[in-house]
Amino acid sequence: MLIPSKLSRPVRLDHTVVRERLLAKLSGANNFRLALITSPAGYGKTTLISQWAAGKNDIGWYSLDEGDNQQERFASYLIAAVQQATNGHCAICETMAQKRQYASLTSLFAQLFIELAEWHSPLYLVIDDYHLITNPVIHESMRFFIRHQPENLTLVVLSRNLPQLGIANLRVRDQLLEIGSQQLAFTHQEAKQFFDCRLSSPIEAAESSRICDDVSGWATALQLIALSARQNTHSAHKSARRLAGINASHLSDYLVDEVLDNVDLATRHFLLKSAILRSMNDALITRVTGEENGQMRLEEIERQGLFLQRMDDTGEWFCYHPLFGNFLRQRCQWELAAELPEIHRAAAESWMAQGFPSEAIHHALAAGDALMLRDILLNHAWSLFNHSELSLLEESLKALPWDSLLENPQLVLLQAWLMQSQHRYGEVNTLLARAEHEIKDIREGTMHAEFNALRAQVAINDGNPDEAERLAKLALEELPPGWFYSRIVATSVLGEVLHCKGELTRSLALMQQTEQMARQHDVWHYALWSLIQQSEILFAQGFLQTAWETQEKAFQLINEQHLEQLPMHEFLVRIRAQLLWAWARLDEAEASARSGIEVLSSYQPQQQLQCLAMLIQCSLARGDLDNARSQLNRLENLLGNGKYHSDWISNANKVRVIYWQMTGDKAAAANWLRHTAKPEFANNHFLQGQWRNIARAQILLGEFEPAEIVLEELNENARSLRLMSDLNRNLLLLNQLYWQAGRKSDAQRVLLDALKLANRTGFISHFVIEGEAMAQQLRQLIQLNTLPELEQHRAQRILREINQHHRHKFAHFDENFVERLLNHPEVPELIRTSPLTQREWQVLGLIYSGYSNEQIAGELEVAATTIKTHIRNLYQKLGVAHRQAAVQHAQKLLKMMGYGV
C-alpha cells in the first residue's frame, strides 16, 4: 500500500504570505522541461510550490523520504503521482509498477512516455525533498526521464542542494527554470506582510525591514521570531539579532531555548514522540504519544505555529517541517532514549494496523525489536517479496539473529529465494545446507520439500539437470497440494529437465500443467516461462505452426499482465525470431531480434549474445558477409568476456562456423575445432546443434569420414527422440557432405528426405544458407520434373531466395557479363550473329535458376504472355527446342566463362 500523504500536495495555510513575484515567474513553468527550486531548509520552497499548484488539476505531487532510495518504492510513488495528475490515464505503467514487472526504472519511464503521448494537456509532476535521494541509479533514471519526457510535461523538483540531473545541459538549452535561495529570501515588503499576519500588534516597517536584513530574508528565522514575540520571551528585534548569521545547522540551541523550553512538558513530550513519524494521522498519534484525540492535538500544535504542515486536502495527514522534524528526532534520542524503543514499537504496531508493513518494518528496525520484526516478516514477507521489496527484506533478515531464522525456517527459505533472485546460486545451497544441519527434523516434511523445490530451480539454472530432476521429484512427493508456489516451481523444473533429456512429449505435458497451475494462482512469470518452453519443445518436434500459436498466447499474456520488461520477454521474441528466420521472413526476424536487444538494454551486454547471433544469422541468410563480419567481431568479444549456458555457446558457434564456410576460412575452422567442447551426448536440440557445428567445420576441412559418423549418429538420436527440426537440419548438412565428396546419388537421396520433412517444419532459410551447392541440386531436381507438388513448390521458393539474397546464377547474365561473353573467343557463332536482348538474357538466367514461366513473370513484373514471347525468341536464337536444352546451353556458357557449375 502507498501512504496517501506522500502523494498529497500540502494544503495552502492561512496567514502565509502570497509570493506574487515568484508566482509570476512560475506562471511560465509549462515552457520548461524542469523547474528547479533549490535552497537550504526553511526558505519556503514547499510553501511556494503549494501556492503555485493551488487550483491546478493536472498536477501530481510526490513527497520523498529516506526510504524512497529503494528503486521499486520510488517507481511506485512516482507513477502513482502521474496517475493522480492524469486521472488514471497510464494504466499499463501503474500495473507494471505495482507488480514490479519492469526491467529498470528507465524502461518503466519509456513505457510511461508511450502512454503519455496520448495526453495532450499541460501536465506537472512535483518531487519534493529530492536531496534525500542518494541512489545513483535513481539519479541516472531521472536524467533519462528529463531527456525524454513529453513536451507538455514539466517536472518540478524541490531540493536543498543542486541535484544530479544534468542541470548544466538544460540551462544551456534554455529548458530550465531556476529559483534559488536569493530569490526565495523574503523582501522587506514580504517580511512586513508576514509579521502583520502573525503578530497581534503590528511592528513598524523600518523595524520589519531591519529584522529581515538581520536574517537575510530567511523564512524560518522570521517564523521563529514571530513565535518568540508571541510568547513574549524577547522582543522581535532581539530574536532577530540572535538569529542573524546562523543557519539550519546551528539552530539546535536556539530551538531548544525558544521553542521546546517555552511549551509545557506534555507538549514537549508530544512533539518529541510524534517526530519519529515521517507522516502522521490521528490513529498513529494516539498510539505513539498515548494521548486521546490525536487529530485535535495536531490541529492545536498547528495553531501554535510549531512547524506542522498538513499534507492533504482532507486534513487527515500531517508532517513536521523537515528542519524542525530533524531537530525533534535528535532531541528525542537524547531526552527520551530509554523510551525510544517502545515509541518505535508503538509506531510499528499502528502502521501494521493500518496495513503498511514496510513502514512498520522501518520502526521495528529502529526499535531493535527482533521479535516484532520476525512477526512482521512471517506475516508479510512473501507479499513484500512478490512486490520486489528486496532491499528492505534483505536489510530486515540481516537484522534477525541466526537463531531466530532457525526457529522460523520460512524465513530461511525467504532469504534463500532472495539469493536465488540475485543469481547467488552457491550461497543458496550453502544457506540451506547450514539450516538443515542445525534445524531439528527439517530433513522431512513440507519445509524440506520447499527447500528441495528451490534447490531444484538453482540446480537447473546452474546447468545440473540430473540433480535438478532428483530434487524436483523429491519436492513433488512431499509437498501438500495446497503449497502451490513450490509445486509450480518443482513441476516447471521437472519439465525443463525432461526437455534437456530430449523427452519432449513428457516435457510438453509438464509445461502445460505448469502453465495451468501458474494461471490459476496468478504466478505470471512461471506461466510465461512454461509457454516459452512449450514453444521451444514444439519447434524441436517440427511443429512450427503450433509453436507460433503458442508464442501468440505468450505475447497475449505479456500484454494482459504487463510483463513486457521481464527478461523472459527477450527469450520469447528471440524464439519468435528463430521461427521467422526458418520461414525466410528475414526482415521480421531481424526486427524481432532487435526488440529482444531493446528489452535487455538495461542489463549487461553479455545478455544480448543470443539476439546478436540471430542478427548475424539474418545477415548470413541474405549473403551480407560484410555486415555479418562486423557483428561477429562484437559476438566474439562477448564470448570472451562471459560465462554462458551450452545452448548459448552452440548458437554463437553456429553463425561463426557458417561464416567460415561461406568465406572458406579453413584456418579459423581448424583452430576452433581443436578447442571446442565435444559433448558426451546429443539428446537435445542445443547438444545436437553443437555437434552439427563440429560436423560443418569437418566438412569445410575435407574431413568427410568423421563428419559422416557424427551426422549419422545425430540422425539416429534425432529419429529416436523425435527431434524433427534437428533431423531436418542434419539431413541438409549430410547433403552438403555427400555433394562435396562427389557422392551425388546419396546427396540427392537425403535432399529429397529434407524437402519432404520441410513440408512439416516449413524450413526455407536452412536450405538457403547452403548457397550455390544447394541451388545447383535444386535446379537439377526441378528439371527432372519428378518432385511431388509440395516439394516442387518449396524447391522453387528456396531457389528464389538464394537468387535474391546470394546473387547466384541469373545475376551472371547482367550487362557486364553479356559484354564479356560476346567478346569471348569461344562464344558460339549463333549468339554473335543473333544476339539476345538484355531482357532475354534475364529470362535465360531465371530459366537456368529453375523458375517456372509464372514465376519469371512475377520476378520481372510482366505478363505471362510476354514471357512466353521472350522464351520463344531466345529458343530460336539459341537453336534449342525446349527448356531442358536451354538450361544445358546456359550451363555451357557459364562453364566457358569460368564459373563452376
Curated annotation (Swiss-Prot):
Any Gene Ontology biological process: positive regulation of DNA-templated transcription
UniProt entry keywords in alphabetical sequence: Activator, ATP-binding, Carbohydrate metabolism, DNA-binding, Nucleotide-binding, Transcription, Transcription regulation
DNA-binding region: 853-872
Activity regulation comment: Activated by ATP and maltotriose, which are both required for DNA binding.
Entry keyword annotation includes ATP-binding: yes
InterPro entries: P-loop_NTPase, Sig_transdc_resp-reg_C-effctor, TPR-like_helical_dom_sf, TPR_MalT, Tscrpt_reg_HTH_MalT, Tscrpt_reg_LuxR_C, WH-like_DNA-bd_sf
GO molecular function: ATP binding; DNA binding; DNA-binding transcription factor activity
Cysteines engaged in disulfide bonds, as pairs: none
Domain HTH luxR-type: 829-894
Residues that bind ATP: S39, P40, A41, G42, Y43, G44, K45, T46
Primary role: Positively regulates the transcription of the maltose regulon whose gene products are responsible for uptake and catabolism of malto-oligosaccharides. Specifically binds to the promoter region of its target genes, recognizing a short DNA motif called the MalT box.
Subunit: Monomer in solution. Oligomerizes to an active state in the presence of the positive effectors ATP and maltotriose.
This protein's name: HTH-type transcriptional regulator MalT
Organism for this UniProt entry: Escherichia coli (strain 55989 / EAEC)
